């Protein structure tokens, strides 16, 4: 039985992108990459994983059925200043380079589907590997519906593990919130 770390990659990147306090764009990008690499290393080590799978975003099929799906994100993006747009372009160039590094220079798996979000890919991976253990790395509460005896979620922002047993502090392994 293998233990997979399934990384909601864009979710992790966006969290890392907004952590750094530096004003210099190169320093902020460097800090975001540092946070991503160290986050994956921490989960790999703490959960004694066998393999890491980076799940990437594609265009959501949900937009074909429900036009307002995540439409507010475009509205917010359009309100950004020119500098913010330029910074985002640089961040996403670094993100693309990092994904290429993971795909070409490591033994990790990188998966993407043009018409599916990372959430969908993670759900399918778990479905296709029912006899293995899975650690989802994301802050997205949508993953709670995937919890099973062989599936947990690690939230690096709160340092909590979500499982069928509830929300546990990753350091103390004590319950922090009752299961809903």
What is the predicted function of each stretch?
Residues 162-180:
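Feature 3881 marks metal-assisted phosphotransfer/nuclease machinery
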Residues 2-137, 143-162:
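Noncatalytic, basic helical substrate-engagement surface that gates or grips nucleic-acid strands
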